[in-house]
């Protein structure tokens, strides 16, 4: 029996709805958030599969979709020497159940996804920032987060403290909207006339 058939049989046995998806040459499945934990647990505890290692957990933002956030779990079976990708999708105001009860390494991954995207994981109450500063506003990997951010951090020599100030750009913001890296824009930017 193929690996795909074993996984689909395991999901059907537990009444878990999964959909196979294509992610290059990798074996991958899409699952709704309410089926995520039962599916991860079944994959880990199955004697045939033994997907016991969570190698990565990350998020992506697709603001044009109703469920804009994609959360991806990469699993490894040392027994089979196979990898498996599990994807789930949530909207901005939904949360995902935390997988901390299944994989010990999940806490830091979930903190990173929360820090970068603002995706909440039910059952993980540790909302401390892990990559950004504690006073940081927003979630920087969201597509609607401004490129320059909201504040800049500087060390103030007079007060001998870190100071948060509004962003002040010393140069004018330029729009790079080339249709291709091989074509120049059709308009003239200030200063370009000197090159002619």
From Swiss-Prot:
Lineage: superkingdom: Bacteria
Topology relative to the membrane: Peripheral membrane protein
DNA damage found in the keyword field: no
InterPro entries according to UniProt: NADH_DH_suC, NADH_quin_OxRdtase_su_C/D-like, NADH_UbQ_OxRdtase_30kDa_su
Gene Ontology CC, one term: plasma membrane
Protein localization: Cell inner membrane
Cysteine-cysteine disulfides: none
Pfam families registered for this protein in UniProt: Complex1_30kDa
Keyword RNA-binding: no
Annotated keywords: Cell inner membrane, Cell membrane, Membrane, NAD, Quinone, Translocase, Transport, Ubiquinone
GO molecular function: NADH dehydrogenase (ubiquinone) activity; NADH:ubiquinone reductase (non-electrogenic) activity; quinone binding
EC number: 7.1.1.-
Predominant localisation class: membrane
Catalytic activity: a quinone + NADH + 5 H(+)(in) = a quinol + NAD(+) + 4 H(+)(out)
Family label: Belongs to the complex I 30 kDa subunit family.
Function: NDH-1 shuttles electrons from NADH, via FMN and iron-sulfur (Fe-S) centers, to quinones in the respiratory chain. The immediate electron acceptor for the enzyme in this species is believed to be ubiquinone. Couples the redox reaction to proton translocation (for every two electrons transferred, four hydrogen ions are translocated across the cytoplasmic membrane), and thus conserves the redox energy in a proton gradient.
Subunit comment: NDH-1 is composed of 14 different subunits. Subunits NuoB, C, D, E, F, and G constitute the peripheral sector of the complex.
Protein name per UniProt: NADH-quinone oxidoreductase subunit C
The species this protein was found in: Rickettsia bellii (strain RML369-C)
Gene designation: nuoC
